[in-house]
Regions:
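Conserved serine DD-peptidase/penicillin-binding transpeptidase domain
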Residues: 1-315, 399, 422, 430-439
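Small-residue-rich helix-loop
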Residues: 32, 274-277, 281-440
Length: 440
């Protein structure tokens, strides 16, 4: 039958080191979790799969992108698609090195290499000292990546990230490659199995975990066959085509391998410290799933709205269409943001939330800001950045030890982002200095 790898929303099937400390660290290979699962399958004694290798992400509704996301974001890591079967933040790495001589084609490769993407390499090696200029493009729905430009002799090379349009299909292809390296024969195709959208899931999703959010962070990615293998049988018999119904691990499936995620609290730090959009979107789906919506945008946003109203925000102070803030149609006022931060500070989980925020001059998205100023270590805040938009909201402490909450939004500006950030940072230094900056 088919061999199915089922995603349950774990965002950290990658080489990311957890818990997060100061900066993102990755331990190669970033395929290690899938390598371990492939080892489990090999140890099970399986030798042949007569059916297909299927990447199944039906645990969440099939809604890869949110309303209001810009088309030019979708090719890159910031706009990586949402999938219950997520690998490596749903990006591949494109490695580029210069050739041996000026005029030679550059050396390019995809990491991990699975044969899923075709590279059209038009990058030429230029003379030493010439500025590197590289362009990368993938059309929506295409598996050809076009690369062009120049890279000079002696250049150390570059690693670019490119979003994977169908993560479930990519994981299926990658896992097939790992199984074949272990001597397992695959006779069928490689494909993805998606759900039929939010409405389908509202009616049909199987709530396989009855748990609160912290317990449900141990979501698993498991391999299961849709028919049990007989005792001593080292092959999976052929089966009927899959119709796209929600998949789950049940008595009719034989589990060959499984992996459990790290605690959800670890990923909250990743989301807030590094502004990890995809992980924020997956957290939104998890909230919706636990509220019985089947893991849809709509269900997650409904739960968030209920929470915000409970926190004291007014209905006309916010509109959200995604979990990351990437949508241009997300709206919220600075006053509402301050109200939310005050509410959070008074909750039992408030201290943990504040600790998950970037620290000025120390880590995350604020590591390089406030350097050599009294504000270093005194600001715990979340950044927000889109083209023509910059924001900073969070908690601060003055030189006299007074704590304060703040939210600064700069919208629809046409200035270099560096100048806007400098202005925001100047405001923060005044606040941290008890308003003394600039006084004589």
């Amino acid at each position: 039958g088919d061999l199915v790898i089922i995603g349950r929303g774990d965002p950290n099937i990658s080489g990311r080191v957890l818990p997060y400390a100061l900066k993102t660290q990755r331990t190669p290979p970033h395929t290690q979790i899938l390598e371990d699962m492939a080892d489990q399958v090999a140890r099970s004694g399986l030798k042949t799969v007569d059916g297909d290798v299927i990447g199944d992400d039906t645990y969440y509704a099939f809604e890869r992108y949110a309303e209001g996301w810009a088309l030019d974001d979708l090719q890159w890591s910031d706009g990586a698609p949402v999938s219950a079967l997520t690998f490596n933040d749903n990006v591949v790495f494109i490695n580029v090195l210069p050739g041996d001589r000026a005029g030679d084609k550059a050396l390019v490769g995809v990491e991990p290499e699975t044969g899923y993407y075709e590279l059209d390499n038009r990058i030429v090696t230029s003379a030493a000292g010439v500025t590197r200029r590289i362009g990368i493009h993938r059309d929506p729905g295409a598996k050809k990546i076009v690369l062009w430009g120049t890279i000079p002799l002696g250049d150390a090379g570059t690693k670019e990230t490119l979003a994977i349009e169908d993560p479930a299909e990519f994981v299926a292809q990658l896992f097939r490659t790992l199984l074949e390296r272990r001597g397992i024969t695959i006779r069928g195709k490689t494909r993805a199995r998606h759900g039929e959208g939010a409405q389908f899931f509202v009616a049909s999703a199987v709530a396989s975990q009855q748990a609160n959010v912290s317990e449900a962070s141990a979501q698993d990615s498991a391999l299961a066959t849709n028919t049990p293998a007989a005792a001593g049988d080292n092959s999976l018999p052929s089966s009927a085509p899959v119709q796209g119904t929600p998949a789950d691990i049940s008595s009719s499936n034989k589990v060959l391998a499984e992996h459990f995620s790290t605690p959800l609290a670890d990923d909250i730090r990743v989301i807030n410290k590094t502004s990890q959009n995809l992980h924020a979107e997956l957290a939104l789906r998890l909230v919706g799933k636990l509220r019985g919506s089947g893991g849809s945008f709509e269900g997650g946003i409904a739960a968030v709205k209920q929470f915000l109203l409970q926190a004291g925000l007014k209905d006309d102070e916010f509109t959200f269409l995604d979990g990351s803030g990437l949508s241009r149609r997300d709206l919220v006022t600075p006053a509402a943001t301050v109200q939310l931060l005050i509410y959070a500070s008074r909750q039992p989980w408030g201290a943990a939330f504040e600790e998950s925020l970037p620290v000025g001059g120390v880590d995350g998205s604020l590591a390089d800001r406030f350097q050599n100023t009294p504000a270093v270590g005194q600001i715990h805040a979340k950044t927000g950045s889109l083209s023509h938009v910059n924001a900073l909201s969070g908690y601060g402490q003055t030189a006299a030890g007074k704590r304060f909450v703040f939210s600064i939004f700069c919208n629809n500006h046409n200035m270099p982002g560096s100048k806007v950030l400098a202005a925001i940072d100047s405001i923060m230094q005044v606040l941290v200095g008890d308003g003394q900056a600039g006084k004589k």
